[in-house]
Regions:
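Conserved N-proximal alpha/beta basic substrate-recognition cap immediately N-terminal to
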Residues: 2-135, 142-144, 157
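Catalytic core of tubulin tyrosine ligase-like
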Residues: 117, 129-207
Length: 207
């Protein structure tokens, strides 16, 4: 026992809890850093410090979290991570602060709610461009890593079963060495009041 350790105190490893959606790499990193994995059969339901999963938590789970526990999602963050909700918030901000600040946002339609608006815009642009092809991109609202994305020029090829967004496809993107690219930056948001963000020093550039 260390000299400055209170009598009777024992240092226990931090415990992380996962579900079937938690990536293996997350578990491996936590184990390498000395964490212990939560065992529902051996431990009480409150004997964990971090619950990490890909899906969001219900508000009741946020309310009932103990002082020694953390969840890897803040309440309400799906408003930013779901493509349809993000689009609605950006459009609302555009109305509040003016279009010039939001020129980076291509024309966006949330389907099926904006279907009539999209059809009107589609045929309006088709009439203006005449024989020239115009491309649109359709993205499922809740999927990631390029899953379910389609690019189309003919509205007959538009097929969707769930909520999605349709955006004007950017045909002249920024290229680096004639390749498309994007940046992936990793951050940890620890709070919103005040907004506190830690940016990881290393990121990815994808081509």
């Amino acid at each position: 026992m260390a000299e400055d350790e209170p009598p009777g105190a024992s240092l226990k490893p931090l415990v992380f809890r996962v579900d079937e959606t938690t990536p293996e790499v997350v578990q491996s990193v936590l184990l390498e850093r000395g964490w212990s994995k939560f065992d529902q059969q051996e431990q009480n339901m409150e004997d964990w410090n971090l619950y990490w999963r890909t899906s969001s938590f219900r508000m009741a789970e946020h309310v009932n979290v103990k002082p020694w526990q953390c969840l890897n999602h803040h309440p309400g963050t799906t408003r930013l991570t779901r493509k349809d909700l993000l689009a609605k918030h950006l459009q609302h901000m555009e109305r509040l602060y003016g279009a010039p600040l939001y020129e980076f946002l291509p024309p966006t339609f949330v389907m099926p709610h904006d279907y009539s608006k999209f059809v009107a815009e589609y045929f309006k642009e088709k009439q203006v461009l005449d024989a020239k092809l115009s491309y649109w991109i359709c993205k499922p609202a809740e999927l990631s890593r390029g899953r379910g994305i389609i690019i189309f020029s003919d509205i007959k090829n538009l097929i969707f079963a769930d909520t999605c967004i349709i955006q004007k496809y950017i045909c002249n993107p920024l290229l680096v060495g004639r390749y498309k690219c994007d940046l992936r930056v990793y951050v940890c948001v620890t709070g919103f009041k005040p907004l506190t963000i830690y940016i990881y020093q290393e990121g990815l550039v994808r081509f």
